UniProtKB/Swiss-Prot annotation:
This is UPF0473 protein LVIS_1220. InterPro entries: UPF0473. It holds the Pfam family DUF1292. It comes from Levilactobacillus brevis (strain ATCC 367 / BCRC 12310 / CIP 105137 / JCM 1170 / LMG 11437 / NCIMB 947 / NCTC 947) (Lactobacillus brevis). Belongs to the UPF0473 family. Transmembrane segments: none annotated.
Amino acid sequence: MNEDQEQITLVDENGNEELYDVLFTFESDDFGKSYILIYPAGKSDDEEVDIQAYALPADDDPANPSGGDLQLIESDEEWDMVESVLNTFLADGTIDPNAGSKD
């Protein structure tokens, strides 16, 4: 893992906090949104990871996300686009391509 890895904390409906590493963020002109892909912090490079994707709040900068409520991706069209971007990213072998999920 990159020691300078950006991290965020997600808080669930019960107030439990969990730390995540940011895999990457990107913008989609087609959907007019920005997205963030994350995975649980503390995973070693050879461990399978559960990659999660969310839409960023409308006023958040994808180059420097500042927080707020992440939005669930709800449409199949958006998921297809996010998965395509993720697969392109994974093609360079950075993370196991069999690890992604829609959770």
